[in-house]
Amino acid sequence: ESDNNYVPGVWAIGDVLKGEGYNQEFLIGSDKKFAGRSSYFHGHGNYDIFDYYTAIDRGYIDDDYMVWWGYEDEKLFEYAKNELNNLASKDEPFNLTMLTVDTHFTDGYVCELCQNQYDEQYSNVIACSSRQVSEFLDWIKQQDFYDNTTVVISGDHLTMDSDYIERQNATDFNRRTYFTIVNGAAVNEKPCVEREYTTLDLYPTTLAALGVQIEGNRLGLGTNLYSGEDTLIEKYGLDYINVELLKDSQLYRKKLLYGKN
């Protein structure tokens, strides 16, 4: 793994914000090298990365401390408060991105904050995580930097615990990955319309929420959801887009994936 070998030909949110002078940090409770995360965040925005080993180096946890993927989300949120205050004190634009993992497959991690509300461990962990996110957001709203700060909350994927979903009798439920924006700077041109969108659309939408003006309201294959423009799946349908994305692309394989002209 090098510092910039993860799809070096793409231009990501971190690249855009770096160009605008943002201080950027990625905060996780596990090893930064897992799944190429270090390569991506160093190569696309020069993020400072605070991971499991950073917490050890700073004396926050003992050398032999290891739960779940490294340290639990309860600690992650507390560390994030310190990091946010440090970033805000510089009086420069900042982007703190953090990844929670207590709700990961299988069954999640039961921390000291979890309550025994439900019969299933996973249900208790999900409820506990929701409370922690809510309390963290409430804390952010009380800080001086909040008025000029946008918060994006996004799931990376649905749960992989299909057995749990079946036990909850939720197999017929149209499950969606959670995504919301709090205190965004953009105005929604379709406030009462249910949108059909994919992860591709979150790129321009997130930047628009930060106040970025996007010519044509499109970046890459994504559409700014604040705009009145149709997304690709609204225009062509999901099945058609899936077929097109499976086709071979020389642009992707050479330019985006490997950074070659």
Language-model-detected regions and their locations in the chain:
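Solvent-exposed soluble domains appended to multi-pass membrane proteins
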Residues: E1-N261
